[in-house]
Structure formats: structure tokens, C-alpha cells
Amino acid sequence: MLKCIPLWRCNRHVESVDKRHCSLTAVPDEIYRYNRSLEELLLDANQLRELPKPFFRLHNLRKLGLSDNEIQKLPPDVANFTQLVELDISRNDISEIPENIKFCQSLEIADFSGNPLTRLPDGFTQLRGLAHLSLNDVSLQSLPNDIGNLSNLVTLELRENLLKSLPSSLSFLVKLEQLDLGSNVLEVLPDTLGALPNLRELWLDRNQLSSLPPELGNLRQLVCLDVSENRLSELPTEISGLIALTDLLLSENLLEILPDSIGSLKKLSILKVNQNRLVHLTDSIGECENLTELMLTENLLQSLPRSLGKLKKLTNLNVDRNRLSSVPAELGGCVSLNVLSLRDNRLGKLPPELANATELHVLDVAGNRLQNLPFALANLNLKAMWLAENQSQPMLKFQTEDDEQTGEKVLTCYLLPQQPSSSLENLLERSVDEAWPTDTNLNRVSVIQFRDDSKHEEEDDETAADKRGLQRRATPHPSELKVMKNVIEARRNEAYTARPDEDLESPDAEEKRLSGLSNQSHDSQASSSTTSATSHEDKQGINSTGVELNDGQVQEEEDLDEMEVEYTEPTVHFAEEPIIRGGDEDDDYDNDDDDAERSDEVSQTPSFPAEKQRLIRKDTPHYKKHFKITKLPKPETVAALLQGFSHDGLSPTAHTPENERDGEDDEEEEEDEDEEDDLHTPFQHRLDAAELEDIRMSQMNSSLQPVKGVSFDQVNNLLIEPARIEEEELTLSILRQTGGLGISIAGGKGSTPYKGDDEGIFISRVSEEGPAARAGVKVGDKLLEVNGVDLHGAEHHTAVEALRNSGAAVVMTVLRERMVEPENAITTTPLRPEDDYFPRERRSSGLPFLLDPDCPAVSTGPAQRLATCLIRNDKGLGFSIAGGKGSTLYRVGDTGIFISRIAEGGAAHRDNILQVGDRVISINGVDMTEARHDQAVALLTGTSPTITLVVDREQSSVGGASPRTRPHSPPPPEPSDSPEQEDGGDEHLGNHLNCPMEDEYPIEEVTLIKAGGPLGLSIVGGSDHASHPFGINEPGVFISKVIPNGLASQSGLRVGDRILEVNSIDLRHATHQEAVRALLSNKQEIRMLVRRDPSPPGMQEIVIHKQPGEKLGISIRGGAKGHAGNPFDPTDEGIFISKVSSNGAAARDGRLRVGMRILEVGNNSLLGMTHTEAVRVLRASGDSLVMLICDGFDPKSASTIEASPGVIANPFAAGIVRKNSMESISSVDRDLSPEEIDIMQKEVEMVRETSQWEREEMEKVSLSSGPLKLDYKTLAALPTTSLQKVNRASPSEPFRIDSPVRDAAHSPHNSQSNIHFPSNANTKDNASTKPGAIQPLSRVRPPVSPASQDGHSSPNPFQHGLSPINSQTTDLYSPRNNVSAKQPSPETPSPLGRHSPEQRSFKDRQKYFEIDVKQQTPDKPKPRISLVGEDDLKKMKEEEAKRIEQRAREFMLDEDEEEEEEDLAKQVAHMKAHGKVVLDGVEYKVESLGSPTSRQCATPPNYSATPPSHCGSSGPSSIDGKGDSQRNSVEDSFRLEQRPNSMTGLIPVYPGESAAPIRTAKAERRHQDRLRMQSPELTVALDKELSPAEKRALEAEKRAMWRAARMKSLEQDALKAQMVIAKSKEGKKRGTLDQLSESPSPAPTPSPTPMEDISPRTVTSPGRLSPGAADDVHFMDESSSNAVSVIDPEVPVAATSALEEMALYSNKRKLRQGRRSLEAPVPT
């Protein structure tokens, strides 16, 4: 029998080892210790060179990973791996696969890729189980001819080999679904390839195929066919048979035509025919109704078929680099088309019908010959329109004009008409992309010249340049900018001398001017301006890195935080009538491209000859602003544009943190720095001197204007006269302080102008708190004089020196511009209200709103009209607006525009006139009473440095509070399907449905100044993320953690604050990632708008101090990505307290309760943490625990929900989800200190040695057949409450285990969940109680689980979750687990008082506890290490057998036998009738395993904590013999007194004291029978009459009386048995627990080895345990015994019920030896 006892250490039961990326040079020796259990070994990515002999003794390996090593040889011993299923030896140096691999018949997945193999062994094709074979990049030159024998292959990868042909037997692989033959040298394919009926993917790319076999058309299941990069000149017509084909890749072949049969591919979704020789595209392409992507790049197509218009699902059409001269009008029928690329063709015109493709977002027509664009394209929502190869912005501004030939209205811009691209001539030789210079060195070609291919040879260069040549510079390198600046200056001087007073040009000159304009690289520098479409070299020059005079202050990048009006409505605006500029304007235009944008400042010019008037573009948008071509704009928007919005990308006021230096010498390259700043500040503007010239020009020509101030053009574009700008000289005195003046300057003679062409010195930056700011210096002031030094016409360095040498007192004279109202304010109304539209994207203008507390309608009280003029500073205007037509109303019933917020410290705040709630009447003279919100935004974000506002203030207005008062922000609007709610960004921001709630929570603006460190906060929530416990009814982004003394904490932020905005970015509806990005933006200053939402209910911080050695005593449930801890909200990922132990610091503290939510532990926020992480944090908390908690859920309500019939309380337990329950509930009291662990390990070692001896003794004394009798000493010493019975399942309902389950093997939780160490264990005190295998029954009714209500196991045991007893009912190593059995819980008694063995004779009781120890013969016996010699063992067995038989005869002849058998027969019948039994005064409910109502697995009570699979466990079965590899079976088996045995079929109750004294077991039985006959419910009442102490005293008294009667008669036999055991112990070192073996174990019930880990655990939902259930687990008193269970590991689970077993014992039958099937009733 010793061969069945595993004598190796229990920690050697390991199933999986992962040693990847461990830099191993040899296989670790420890792995060989696991040779009997190891199933998965991963040694990938190490430096192994060889595999030693012992490695191949790991016979049970099922998965072996050795990839990415340096293994040079695979030994033939690999044949030992007969169980191997998955083998990965890819990327090694193995040159040959051994022939013996054919013996690995279990192999299903093999990867040999990346080895220098040249052939496969002959026996390789015998691996008939192989399903997935990878042989990529192994230099194979041929495949075995019999490869068809691998009939189960599903995937075959042969990429990057040297295969020239394929064997015909390949057609036998009928299960093959994926065949990859890419990157070989195949020249022809076998016809048999078409005989693979299940083939779904066929990869033949990068071969040398010149044709495809027609049989390929038989592949009816084929989904993807890739034959790109071959030599195909045609496709077979049979390709129409590929009816399931979705992807057809034909790139880089020699195809000239596609077969008409391609139209039969109805499921075709992607067709790529790029880089072929197609000259014609078949009309049948239109029949491919599911086609979404059609790539025809680089062919010879001259036209497209009209049938393309039938492709309603086509989203991407690319016909770049062909020879198209026209596009079919039917293309507009492609209603789903998103991207249309026609680059580098010969198109002269686009059809207007393209506008019908309403989903078109990107149109690329660069490199064509377009004269103009159809006017209908204005209706498209384009995001990108590419007209030139080096166009810097995706969108341009267009104007309308009449086509000279057709008279139709068309669109044009400065890039039209197009110049033909030279790449057309090189179409077949190279692509434009390849010709594009990619080098970054300074010698690269910086000029790209385009010439007309037909005429440039005949014309001289100058003529060609004037008429045809478009010379465009490539994007300059910063080092080139200085040189370019000088060139620009020369050009500017030439321009001034050439045309000083010219008023207008001839048409030829105009054309030359426009060509010259194009010559100056409008678009080559995308980064130099935020909003202009062109970028002149002088602007590029500005881009060189420079530094600012920063006075030691950190410069900050910020996007107009106070002025939160960010975007105008993204539209492209057109003026039908050209606006011609003459005179100085033309000089400006020619010399500075940005003036091309600013030309819109002129409202009307004198009438000029209109024969060839050219259009001037307006306001090209920056690609970041979501501008797109759309419907014609509202005239008010155009008014705003003409008013001053047209050049909003140039700001003098931005700051960057780069290149900071102290001292004024930083000013030298100030202009460069400022221009760079514009990249980050698209809405900070400046007024150019060019604008002044424009305005002066318009004033000079005012007599020529037919209408003063306003006019309309033919497309209803409202043209408004801009406000006048006056200049005034100011003298300011500054007292210098240490650190500088606090200003930066830009400009100067010879430097890039700061404004237009004005080469004066300008103030480009003013530090807020600096001396200059206090003296009144403002950004944009022109510096005329410093301390008497005249700076008119001075160079930059002269000004720097003047400022540097100015001393402590600086007197400077500046020229400042101010806005003057236009003479006639114009009221505008929408001319075509039907054109209202809302852009598709939500704009992020972030306008906060004030909400009146009572949401009043428009007040009719007296109004006070106020006017103010605000000067835009570096942070904008400093206020926000809300309301307007088409937007969310600021006040109910009032469509007006109101001041909704005033930024503290901003321009409006310092002006101290505007107040929150003021109604805006006009902006810069434009009436706003009936205006839309976006129109007001457009006016406010114009480039004008001053904004004149007229507002009305109601005397009783709530908004009339101090401007310092932080206005409230409304809650997010309700969901709506209306376009206003769906599309409008600004319109989203004020919803007043919840106005009363809004005022309850104050709103504050908090500014965080980054100092290089973190912000000190964490957030939770977002539109795509749960934000529990914050904002459950109103989702949003919340602060979930504030680090003490961090930046956020110092700024007053607290946990629970709702973040409404960050740097003007609205986060009310933002996703979590958007909020994170906003907070992590590269800004020095983070401005946050937060709403002080109330804290979650019950939020408090508690501090718990643990006493030395004391455990915290709580269990938790929930966590992210796991099972929800809140039974009322499945989306709640919070961490909740699921249990508070009665023994622990938490219970002593008294403030923690079940159901509470834990927000923080120490400084660690648990929000968003997984369950495992939360457990780890709690365990690492130390002796002093600081917790932030709040109310969670009501455990009483939760228990009612979970106990409801028909409700699956936990999907894991019900087998719905395969999940480890440890992820849902864990005790936090599991970590031990290293010292404690060391002590525990020593104890385990002792227990292990003892258990091995005990097993031997069990075999010696049992002889595998006879029942083992208990000696009287053991029976007398052990209290009867500690005796346990091994339950047997009834034969009629067999114990079922469907299949071995190993899922739990890899759970890190399982490895801990079953470790049960008793606290304060003192084995020395147990001398009076010989350690044995008797275990106290848990006096707790196990919680029922719905999992097993069907009475049988799930057909698929993998669907069962782990039974959670091990994880939820025990807090390991916790004192609360050692609850004394003297304290039964009053909650647990069950109304079941029944028979008690206390009335039986002692002999009968002893027979009742006899255990048959049966041998279970394994299929493949494994060698066991015997610690006892064979001779001694044989003698001991014989002696013990004689004694046992003698004792059996004596007991059979006992005088009371017949009477007891009669009583027992009655008792068995009664127990069967009532299903209950009383043992030792404890009543048990006997449940049959197979019954439909059974809710527990009736497994032996002291089996380990892993149940058979039918109990809902993913643990191992006893049949399989292989268990949870990471489970510590020592603790499972030997610390069972710690474990509640709630899985037994016996449910204890406690009968009360009877009225009359009972002194025998029979008398007690008779009394209980009487009680049952009278009133069964009395058992509960009687049980409650006695206190626990009284019950124990009564039971002890009865036991003492019953024991005394039989002690003498057994004394002799017991002594003899102990002598035999003592003899076997001689010479052996005895551990503390070696006394276990001194008496034969009275109840050697099986405590399995790890391979037979069947546990008594209830199948209870994790987290669904009733709150007190775990506390009601009672154990034997610590002083009574420290017993451990020791068993024969091969004992099968008996399949008879406890009732039948009692009958068996009474009849003295012996159960048949041998292995019993768990699938059928066990014969008796």
C-alpha cells in the first residue's frame, strides 16, 4: 500500500512554471522536482543552449515553450513527451527535428518557425493529431509528399521559405482553414489546391506566380485571397466561384484587365489592384454591392466606369497616379464615400454631382489640371481638400466666381487653377511619394518646380514662370530661416520702390502678382501659423528659435483660458463679388502673404474694371479648428469675419516655457519666439499695420463706396465696415525691480515685423505682476522712446540696449491703438433662416453658464444700459457668454446672449463694468439681440485687439452680483435627439432643467500652477466610465483622490469635486481618456472649473490601530474588471466590505460594517483597482490603517435579493461564468511576516513528516479491508463533538465527477486560499488529547447556493466557478478562525432534533465510527518511497490483521449486539424517513447527493477545500488525480481544524435538554422520538432554552457516563495496538506532532493529496454569503486538540450515504476493495 502514498514534499505539486525572460542559461534544477505533476513549462526568451537528459523525464508535460533561446539541437528524447499538446521551439538554432518526434502523438500545436531547418523528418507526418503547424522562415525547400496524412491540420503556415512547388497530397488536408505560402518562390500552383473544401484564407503573396489555376474557383469558403507581388497578367474567370470572398488583394502584378466575372463576388469588401497595368476597369465592378474599399493607385486608367455609382457602401476610392481626364458624374451615387483620392491625374473638371456623396470628408485632387471647383461642393462637410502636394492646411478658403466659359457659379481659391504636376510624366517609373525628398540635411532641394510638359521647352524660363511655372518652396529648415529673412527684406524693399503709389494693376500684372504669390510658398510651413492657409517666407523666418525677456518668470502656454469662446462655426465663406485691393494693399499683399487674409478688412473698394478681376481668398482655417466646406454661411457670421475674424492665428501674447533666460538680452530674438507661441494660442490675436493701411485706404476711398458701412453681395454675404482704430501716444513711468521690467519686445529695423510691415519696436509680452504691467504697459504697444533714446526706425539690438541701460526708473513713450465705434451700428437678421445648421463635431468652446436659482423667465424689471471697451490681453477678454438663438437658453424663454462667467484677473474683471447676468446688446456695433450663439463667438474671437460691448443690466437681476462671485455652472443637458443638442458644442453647455439642484453645489475655478511635478490628484468617471460612488445619478468626471500636501490639495481641491472644465475644455460629457488628456496637457497652468458636489453619503476617514499580532478582520468584495461587489449595481466596480470578523481590529473598532465602500486605504485610492490590487493594498497597510469609507449597499436588502427564488445570486456559482471567486471576495488577513512564515513552514514540515508515518500506520493496521477500531483512550479523550463521519453518497444517486478540471491551477488566489494555520497553536498542551484524524464539525448551516439545485453537475465542469468556501468563509491565519466550539451562534440552529448516538452503547458508538480504508488502484501505479522495510511491514500487517479479526469477533459476540441491531434498523428507517440524524448531541440533516434539492456536495467533511467539479468547482477531481498546482495541499490537509466543514451532508442543530434525565443513548433516542411525534418544531425551542455552556456541560456529562461503561473492555487491545505503532517509530526523529501516531487514528477519513483535492465547500456565490455566516463557523477549542487529518491518499470517495453506511457497520459487512467508479452506484 505504500506505493499509493506520495512521500515527496507537498509543495512539489506544481502544474505550471513560467520562467520566461529570466536570462536562464540552463534549465533550473527545481523543475525536475515537479516531474510528476508539471503540465505547463514556459522557458521562452532565455539563453538556453541545450536540454539535459533529466528534462525529458517531465512525462506529464502538456505545454512546452522554448522559443527565443539558443538551443542548437532537439534531442531524440523528445519522444518521452507523450502527453505534449503544445510545443513552441521557434526562433532557436535547431537544424534538425528528430525522427522520434513522431511518438508525440498528443501534439496538436507545433511552432518550429525561425530555425535553420531544411527538411522535415519522415515520421513527422505521423503526427495525425496536429492541428496548427507553423514552419515560417525555416528554409524549407520542399514539403513531404505525404503531408496529406496530417488530416487534422487547420492552420498551416509556410511563409518565408524556399518552396518551389507543392505536393499534390496537400489536397487531403480537408480540415485546413488557413494556408500561408507567402514569400516563397512558387511559380505554379497545383490544381489540387482547389480541393480544400474548408479553406478560408489563402496567402500567396510575394511569389513568382504567373497564373492561377481555374480550380481555385472551387474554394467556396474562401474569405481572403492574397496574390499580391506576383507576376500575374490575368485572373481566371472562374474566380467568380469564390462566393464567400471578402478580401481580394492583387497589388503589384501585371494585370491589364479584370475579368467581368468579378461582379459575381457579391460579398467582396476590399479590392486592391494598385500598381498594375490596368487600362480599363470592367463595368461589372458595380455589381460588387458590398465593396467598401477600392484601391486603383498607379495604373493606366483613363476613365472610370459609370457603374461605380452603384457601390452604395464604398467608403474609400483611391485612383491616384492614373491618367484620368474625367470622373463620371455617377460617382456622386456613392453615398457612403468618405475618402476620394484622385491625385496626380489629368482632371480638368470635377462633376457637380460629387456633392451628392454627402459623407465625403476628404477630397484629394492635387496634381491635376482643375481650373475651378463646382459650386455644389460647398454643401459637403469636407474636412480636407487637397489641391497641391505641399499644401500646409487641409482646408482652404474659397470664393465664388462665374466661370468665363459656361457662366456657371464656381469655387476658386489661390491654388486654382492648378498647374500640372511633373509626376505625370514619371508615372510608371516612380511615384510622387518616392520622388518626394525625405532627407533632412541642409543640402536638400528646397524648391520644387512644376512646368507645363508641352510648352516649357519652347518658352524661356521667365515666360514659363510667369504663365505656367509654379515655383513652390519646400518646408524650410530652421537653420535656413535667417537667410530667407534677408531675401524677404530685399523683396520688400524692391516692392516699395517699384510701386509706391500704384492704385490698381492691369490684368496681366494681377496675374503675375498671383503667380508671384504662389511662388512664395504659401503652404509649405504648416506650423508657422495656426489659422492662415499660407505662410510667407517672412513668416517662416519668424519660426527660428528665439528667447524672450521673461524676467525670471516662467512663461506659460495657455489657450485663452478666461476667454473661453474658442471656435466659430466651422464654415468656408465665399464672396461672390471679388474684393479688389489697390495701392498700398497690393503692396502689402505682394510682400506679406498674411495680408492676403487680412484683405477682408476692406468692406468695399472703388469699382474697378471687372474683365479679369481675380478673387482674393478669405480666412483660410487651420486644420485643427474642424473647419469644412459646408452650406453658405449666415451673413452675420460673415459680418463677424469681415469685422476682424479673418486672421485669428497671429498672437503677440502667447508664452512658451522654452528658451527661458533671465535678463533683457533675451529680447534679441523675441520676434521669433512670439511667432512660435502662436502655435499654441490660436485665438490670441494682434492687429497688423497692414490693417491700419487697409482701413485708412477704405476711409480715403469712402466717397467711392455706394453704401456706407454695409452692403450685401449676391450670395447674401453681409459686408460690414470695420470699426476705426485710433492711435494715441502715452508716456509711462516704470520703477525697475530686481529681475527686470517684466516685458518682452519684438520687431525692429531689419527684423521680422511684429505687425504687418511696421518695423517698429513692439511690446510682445507683459508679465502680469511685473513692474511694466503695474505701470500700464500693454501688449501691442509700440515703443517710441526709452529714457530719451528715440527708437523710431531703431534696430532690435538698439532697443535692447536702451532698455538694459535705462536704470531703475524707466520713462517710455508708447503708441497705443484703440477701437472707435463705427458710425452706424448695424442690426443684422438672418436672411435665410433655413440655412441654420450645426456642425457635426461637438466644439469644445467650454462656455460655462450661470443659472438663475429659480430659473426665472425674462425679467421685465428696469434695465440699466452700460458700455465698455475691453482690450484683449494675453489671456483673452476674460469672460464667457451663454445663450443665443439655436443654443441652450441662458434664461428660460429668453433667446438673448448673456455674460455667464467672468474670469478672475481677466480683462473684464479688471475693467469692473461687466457682471455675470448682463445681457449683451451689441458687440463692436453689431446688434446681438437676435443673434445666434456662434455669431457672438465669431465676433468675440476676432482679431481686433479691443472689443466694444453694450450690455443691459436688470436692476433686480440675480446676475448682478460682484464679478468676483463664482457663477454656477448648469448640470449637463438631458440627452436629446435634436440637432441642437446633438451637434452644437457651445449649445450643449447650458441646460436648465435642473436649475434648483445646480445652486445647491457651488462652482469654483481653481488654477494649478505646475512646478514640474504631478498635479496630485486622480480622477474617476467620464461618459464611458462608471464614476461610483460619485455622480451615480449624474455622471461626470470626479476627483477620486487628492494627495496630501500635493498641488491639488494646496489649491483646495477635494475628493468628490466634479470637474466641469479644464483649460476651457468642457468635460461634462467627455470620456475618461479625454479628461485625462486634458489634465495632462502640456501647460504650465491648469485652470479647472469644479463643482463642489456633496461627498458620498457616509464618507468618513477612520483610523484603525491593530494590536500586536492582531488581524484586521475584514473581507472585501468587488473590484474593477471582476465581479461586481454591489449587488444592486452591476456597473459598480467599487470595493466593499463583505464581512467583518468578530475577532479582529475592525470588529474591536466597531465602525466598519458589511456593505460599506472603501475609497482609500492609506494614500492608495481603491477606486478603479482590481480586486487583487485592493487586497494587496489592504494587506500592506501595517499596524495603523487609515481608511476613507462611505456608505455602500444595505447587506440586508442584498441578502433578500440574493436569496430570491429564480435569482442567480452569482453567475460564477451558477456556472454561467468561468471565474475564480477569489476575484470577488477575499479576506485581507492573509499576509504573514517572514518570521511567521518561517514558523508556519516548520510546523508544516512537522505535520508533513507525521502524516507520512501516519499513513504507513494506517495501512499497517487496516490491511486494506478490516474496519479499524478506535481504542478507548482516544474515544474517551476526544469530545464527541469533535468526531466526524465520512459521508457516503447513496447508491441510487451516485457521486458524479464529469471530468478533471485544472482551471484553478493558475489562480494566484487559490494558492493562498486553502492555507489554514491555527493561531496560537500549542501542541504541547495537547498531550492529553492524542492527535488524531478527528475533526470538529462546523456548527453552521452552510449557505445554500442555487448552483447545484438541479442535483447534478454541469455538463461542462469548466463552466463552474470555484466554490468559494476557501476564500470567503475563512480569513487565513486569523484568530477569528479559532472560534471555540463552546460558542455556537444563536443564528444557526436549525429546527431538526433527531437521534443521538449518546444513547447507544459504547461498542455501538465505536462501530459507528469505524472507517473502511480501501485501496484505490491507480491506472498507472507510480513508484512510492517506502520508509519501512518490506519484512517489517509484512510482519506488522499480519499481527495487526490478527488483532483486528479478534477484536471484530469479540465485538460481534457482544451481548448487546442483537438489541442494538434492532435499534439501528429502526434508526436507519427513521433517518431515511426524516433525513436527519443526531450525533453527539448535534443534529445533522442527511441529504442525498443526487436529489434535486441538494444544495451541498456531500463530500467527506475533512477533505480538503476543493470540491469535485460537480460542486461548482474548477478544482481537480479525485479520479483525475491531478489538482490545483498552486494550491498548498499541506495546509489543505493538515490544518483542517481551522476549516468550517459546511460541505458535509450533515447539518448540525442543537437539541435542548429534555425534561427527564437521560442516561443512555437508547433513552435519549426514545425521548427524541416522543418529541418528534408530539411537535417537531419544539426542537428549536428546546435548543434555545440552554445556554451554550449548559449544553456543553450536559453533553460532557453524558459522554463521561457512556464512556466509562466500555473503557475497561478495550484497554488491553488499545495497548497492544499502540505498541505496534511505537515499534515502527523507533530510530525516527520525532516532531512536535509525532504523538499523532501513538494511537491509531480513530477516524482516518481521507484527506487527499493535492492530486485528489476534493473539498467540503458549499457552492456558494462569492460575495453572496450571508453577513454572519462566516462568523458562525465554530471549531474545536484550541486547547482540546490540534489534530490534523491524515489519510490514505488513494481512498476513493465512497458513494454510499451515511444511512447506508450505518447499516453496513451494524451488519459487520466489509466493503469490497478496489477502485470504485464515481459514475455509478457503489456495490455493497
UniProtKB/Swiss-Prot annotation:
GO-annotated cellular components: adherens junction; basolateral plasma membrane; cell-cell junction; cytoplasm; lamellipodium; membrane; plasma membrane; postsynaptic density
Chain intervals for the UniProt region annotation (Disordered): 451-484, 496-620, 646-683, 955-995, 1283-1407, 1414-1433, 1449-1468, 1488-1555, 1621-1684
Keywords from the named record: Cell junction, Cell membrane, Cell projection, Coiled coil, Cytoplasm, Developmental protein, Differentiation, Leucine-rich repeat, Lipoprotein, Membrane, Palmitate, Phosphoprotein, Repeat, Synapse
PTM section of the record: Palmitoylated.
Residue ranges annotated for the PDZ domain, each copy included: 731-818, 867-955, 1005-1094, 1101-1193
BP GO annotations: activation of GTPase activity; anterior/posterior axon guidance; apoptotic process involved in morphogenesis; cell migration; cell population proliferation; cell-cell adhesion; commissural neuron axon guidance; convergent extension involved in gastrulation
Biased composition (Low complexity): 518-534, 1507-1518
Localization per record: Cell membrane; Cell junction; Cell junction, Adherens junction; Cell projection, Lamellipodium
Short name of any one Pfam family annotated for the protein: LRR_8
Residues recorded with modification Phosphoserine: S1609
Ranges of the LRR repeats in the UniProt entry: 11-34, 35-58, 59-81, 83-105, 107-127, 128-150, 151-174, 176-196, 197-219, 221-242, 244-265, 266-288, 289-311, 312-334, 336-357, 359-380, 382-405
Record's compositionally biased regions (Acidic residues): 554-567, 584-598, 661-678, 1453-1463
Segments of this protein annotated with the region Sufficient for targeting to adherens junction: 1-821
Gene3D superfamilies, sorted: 2.30.42.10, Ribonuclease Inhibitor
Chain's role: Scaffold protein involved in different aspects of polarized cells differentiation regulating epithelial and neuronal morphogenesis. Regulates the caudal migration of the nVII motor neurons. Required for convergent extension movements during gastrulation.
Protein name (Swiss-Prot/TrEMBL): Protein scribble homolog
Source organism of this protein record: Danio rerio (Zebrafish)
Organism lineage: Eukaryota, Metazoa, Chordata, Craniata, Vertebrata
